[in-house]
């Protein structure tokens, strides 16, 4: 049974999953648009939106929380200086998932996740 599961396992161990989602969050913030599978995009959305919300708070504690997860000062600076001010008036929903096609090798559903 799958009751009360608040995240997808993505077929990986916890440390691998966390590292993958961290790297995908960094890629999304840098490029503002990446292509991945639908389930990864849905899981990535949670982390990306949390980082942008930290940026909107713009406190020392929120900057440290963002850095504790991302471990990349350049990306944290981009969140706080460029991305968060764009979403000052928006309450959540900073990302958009657009389903595209299926991957040729394994027919996995692909999607583009981008910042709105």
From Swiss-Prot:
It comes from the Bacteria. GO terms for cellular component: cytosolic large ribosomal subunit. The keyword Ribosomal protein applies. Keywords: Ribonucleoprotein, Ribosomal protein. Pfam families: Ribosomal_L17. The keyword Glycosyltransferase does not apply. InterPro entries: Ribosomal_bL17, Ribosomal_bL17_CS, Ribosomal_bL17_sf. One of its GO terms (biological process) is translation. GO terms for molecular function: structural constituent of ribosome. PANTHER family: LARGE RIBOSOMAL SUBUNIT PROTEIN BL17M (PTHR14413:SF16), RIBOSOMAL PROTEIN L17 (PTHR14413). HAMAP family: Ribosomal_bL17 (MF_01368). Belongs to the bacterial ribosomal protein bL17 family. Part of the 50S ribosomal subunit. Contacts protein L32. This is Large ribosomal subunit protein bL17. It comes from Fusobacterium nucleatum subsp. nucleatum (strain ATCC 25586 / DSM 15643 / BCRC 10681 / CIP 101130 / JCM 8532 / KCTC 2640 / LMG 13131 / VPI 4355). The gene is rplQ.
